[in-house]
Regions:
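A structural "domain/chain start" motif
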Residues: 1-50, 158-178
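C-terminal/domain-edge helix-coil "capping" segments
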Residues: 1-9, 61, 110-178
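Second-shell loop/turn segments in exported
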Residues: 34-43, 90, 130-138
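Mid-chain, structured segments of secreted extracytoplasmic proteins
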Residues: 40-66
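A general alpha-helical scaffold signature found inside nucleotide-binding enzyme cores
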Residues: 44, 48, 97-101, 139, ...
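Surface-exposed short loop/turn segments
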Residues: 64-116, 125-128
Length: 178
């Protein structure tokens, strides 16, 4: 379960693009002398971004793609770019660890990609609290998802890249569009 951010809400209308590649994200990897690993985090993404949006934006919508005609706002498209992991056997600790990198593609009012905000995340889970490797790795991955949510929430209002992007929806910018 993901907590709602306790931050001041942004008033700029935002469209969040939650596409199939995000909601179906599965990391598979074969580790020499360690076996095959499958980490499913895609199914948690919609809940994560619903909570994030509810706590951070006072005016937001969800869409499936940047091509949807209903988008009339700045748009954010999250993408899991990278996932790495370590097991207790590899690190000689009691923890499963997951490192993730999310890219947040930022689109202007004309649906042009203006920039990408990249956020690294880290999560861990104690092996003693989980029944197996898959369960432990998925718990660590969900912890990393909470981490990215926290970083996004805290840094959103202070990140210069975001401030520049939000200015694309200023009244002056909207007037210039006719």
């Amino acid at each position: 379960d993901f907590p709602s951010p306790l931050v001041e809400k942004q008033s700029t209308p935002i469209a969040l693009i939650i596409n199939k590649s995000l909601t179906d994200f599965v990391h598979t990897e074969t580790v020499e002398k360690g076996g095959d690993f499958v980490i499913e985090v895609g199914s948690a993404q919609r809940a994560l971004f619903e909570r994030l949006a509810a706590g951070l934006f006072s005016n937001h919508t969800f869409v499936d793609s940047i091509g949807e005609p209903s988008i009339s706002a700045l748009a954010i498209e999250p993408e899991i770019r990278e996932l790495q992991f370590a097991t207790p056997d590899q690190t000689r600790t009691d923890y499963y660890e997951v490192w993730m990198r999310y890219d947040f593609k930022l689109y202007d009012l004309e649906r042009n990609l203006t920039s990408t905000w990249s956020i690294p995340a880290y999560g861990k889970a104690n092996k003693n609290n989980h029944t197996g490797k898959r369960d432990g790795l998925e718990a660590a991955a969900l912890s990393a998802c909470r981490d990215v949510m926290a970083v996004f929430s805290i840094k959103f209002s202070s990140e210069q890249l975001i401030a520049d992007w939000l200015n694309l929806d200023s009244p002056t910018t909207r007037e210039g569009r006719g």
